[in-house]
Curated annotation (Swiss-Prot):
This is Chaperone protein DnaK. The lineage of its organism: Bacteria, Pseudomonadati, Pseudomonadota, Gammaproteobacteria, Candidatus Pseudothioglobaceae. Keywords: ATP-binding, Chaperone, Nucleotide-binding, Phosphoprotein, Stress response. GO terms for molecular function: ATP binding; ATP-dependent protein folding chaperone; unfolded protein binding. PANTHER family: HEAT SHOCK PROTEIN 70KDA. Residues 604-634 are annotated as: Disordered. It comes from Vesicomyosocius okutanii subsp. Calyptogena okutanii (strain HA).
């Protein structure tokens, strides 16, 4: 049975881990890194798709086709405020899909966020397969605890498109708690996981208990903001640099995508440096040019300045902490330990602020970049039978219900209810002789239906004619272990039972997902062909170089005719190497190799002549020797 892998699909970076011999192993990617940038690029002059570090390296010269922070779009509608805000901040195009979702447009092709995220998941899958030496087909994938149903379903779709059966969706703070608690916590403890990542913020309060040798992890409450993270901190820094440059040089860099991409990289680097230094310098020569000539950016920035730029963002993380405590019916004094997760928590101001709020020094013995993937691997181990005596009880982050008369949301499942769970309630008709009812499913905390997230709606038809209020329609909401919702309805008066599938108001249809799965498989073949073509071209280049070098070294050893034949073969190969015809390249490589065999023979003969006198001299110097073994008496 193949391993179930654990994947942390992050906004900025992603990570993959497995259970290996009873412990968690973070798997290094092909570049030797333990985390992979969640960046996908489509080069202008190639059909190749770049993922990770390769995509990040070319971002400056290809900003409009380099996609990052796609997780912030997954499962979102184009009209949402968070999406509209992002449109002005990213160099690539965010467009409205036919179903109303937020998609991106790259090289004149519209693409769904799950389809793009699948490329990153695919890279994680390949990383695990290279390490294990076998195909991987199953995974546990993490999501922010505050992700709604649409975002969770979209993440599962991304896994499916990447060729994985997603066995479980697990909340990121819960995963981090697993990574921390399985080995490091003894006895019963109540911990807070404060997770400030690249694009999302979550806080969860988790009770860890040892019950008859079994570790129980029960989430008491969770809260957060799915559009708050390190990317927003970077944007504040970019905004400051743009303003300072405009004051100094009178040039607005926001109109220059290439300059903005350079600024983004520099801002991220400066932010990281300010976690360990009080001051840093952003130096970008030739950042842009105008009629007067090239312009250079050179700006010093202090840690205090960065803290002032992001002060309101930091404060935004405290309100969810207060709400989580209130929902769990706890105070800060009830918290035993605080765990920091997510790269942005390396900022000293974050640590200080969290410490002041909870009145406890946060634990630093968890790697904030790797803890979530480690927890996902532990959950994968539980599902695969590799990990025993661990029980995880998670919660739904938002309330679920349906719209009732007057545009009111009637909640059937309250937020922070332990999952899996289900709830049923009897509803009726609003008019006499009503033969059908529309069930509108909602997720959120507001009383007004329109202020909540619409998950979809369906019609229950064939209701018998009766006065209003008489028919009894039982609506059941069922949440599985992934936090994904299924809805059913039954007319109790007739006994007729109907299975209802919600026609989602957003998201990908089964047909679209299947098409994307097939596209991904087709591209996998294309990618493999491309890799083989590159290998052939590299071999051809190397052969041309070595043959030319040997020709020059042996110019006095070969005839003009021999030289002409070899040079003609080199020219033929140089011509065909410009094409994408692998078979033609391989044929010409074989021809040149055969022709160059003459050179190899002459080179060996020449080397033999040079070595003979030395070899003879060496043989004269050989004498027998007696060896005495010296024993060490130590």
């Amino acid at each position: 049975m193949s391993k179930i892998i654990g994947i942390d699909l992050g906004t900025t970076n992603s990570c993959v881990a497995i259970m290996d011999g009873g412990s968690v192993k973070i798997i290094e990617n092909s570049e030797g890194d333990r985390t992979t940038p969640s960046i996908i690029a489509y080069p202008k002059d190639s059909e190749e798709v770049l993922v990770g570090q390769a995509a990040k390296r070319q971002a400056v010269t290809n900003p409009e086709n380099t996609l990052y922070a796609i997780k912030r779009l997954i499962g979102r509608r184009f009209e949402e405020d968070a999406v509209q805000k992002d449109i002005d901040l990213v160099p690539y195009k965010i467009v409205k899909a036919d179903n109303g979702d937020a998609w991106v447009k790259v090289k004149n092709k519209k693409m769904a966020a799950p389809e793009i995220s699948a490329k990153v998941i695919g890279k994680m899958k390949k990383t695990a397969e290279d390490y294990l030496g076998e195909e991987v087909t199953e995974a546990v994938i993490t999501v922010p605890a505050y992700f709604n149903d649409s975002q969770r379903q979209a993440t599962k779709d991304a896994g499916k498109i990447a060729g994985l059966n997603v066995k479980r969706i697990i909340n990121e703070p819960t995963a981090a708690a697993l990574a921390y608690g399985v080995d490091k916590v003894k006895g019963d403890k109540t911990v807070v996981v404060y997770d400030l990542g690249g694009g999302t913020f979550d806080v969860s309060i988790i009770e860890m208990e040892d019950i008859d040798g079994e570790k129980h992890f029960e989430v008491l409450s969770t809260n957060g903001d799915t559009f708050l993270g390190g990317e927003d901190f970077d944007q504040r820094m970019i905004g400051y640099l743009v303003d300072e440059f405009k004051k100094d040089q009178g040039v607005d860099l926001t109109n220059d995508p290439m300059a903005l991409q350079r600024l983004k990289e520099a801002a991220e680097k400066a932010k990281i440096e300010l976690s360990s230094s009080e001051q840093t310098e952003v130096n970008l020569p030739y950042v842009t040019a105008d009629a007067s000539g090239p312009k250079h950016l050179n700006i010093k920035i202090t840690r205090a300045k960065l803290e002032s730029l992001v002060e309101d963002l930091l404060k935004r993380t405290i309100e969810p902490c207060k709400t989580a405590l209130k929902d769990a019916d706890l105070s800060t004094g009830d918290i035993d330990e605080v765990i920091l997760v997510g790269g942005q928590t390396r900022m000293p101001k974050v640590t200080k602020m969290v410490q002041n709020f909870f009145d406890k020094e946060p634990k630093k013995d968890v790697n904030p970049d790797e803890a979530v993937a480690m927890g996902a691997a532990i959950q994968a181990g539980v599902l695969g039978g590799d990990v025993k005596d661990v029980l995880l009880l998670d919660v739904t982050p938002l309330s679920l219900g349906i719209e009732t008369m007057g545009g009111v949301m009637t909640k059937l499942i309250e937020k922070n209810t332990t999952i899996p769970t289900n709830a049923s309630q009897i509803f009726s008709t609003a008019a006499d002789n009503q033969s059908a009812v529309t069930v509108h499913v909602l997720q959120g905390e507001r009383e007004i239906s329109s202020a909540n997230k619409s998950l979809g709606q369906f019609n229950l038809e064939g209701i018998n004619s009766a006065p209003k209020g008489q028919p009894q329609i039982e609506v059941t909401l069922d949440i599985d272990s992934d936090g994904i919702l299924n809805v059913s309805a039954k007319d109790k008066n007739t006994g007729k039972k109907q299975s209802i599938t919600i026609k989602a108001s957003s998201g990908l249809s089964d047909e679209e997902v299947e098409k994307m799965v097939k596209d991904a498989e087709a591209h996998a073949d294309e990618d493999q062909k491309f890799q083989k073509l590159v290998t052939s071209k590299n071999m051809a280049d190397a052969l041309i170089h070595s043959t030319k070098q040997t020709l020059d070294e042996l110019k006095d050893e070969i005839s003009i005719d021999e030289k002409s034949v070899i040079e003609a073969s080199i020219t033929d190969l140089e011509k065909v190497i410009k094409s994408d015809n692998k078979e033609a390249i391989d044929t010409k490589v074989k021809t040149l190799s055969e022709k160059a065999q003459l050179l190899a023979e002459k080179a060996q003969a020449k080397a033999g002549v040079k070595n003979t006198p030395q070899e003879e001299k060496n043989s004269d110097d050989v004498v027998d020797a007696d060896f005495e073994e010296v024993k060490d008496d130590k």
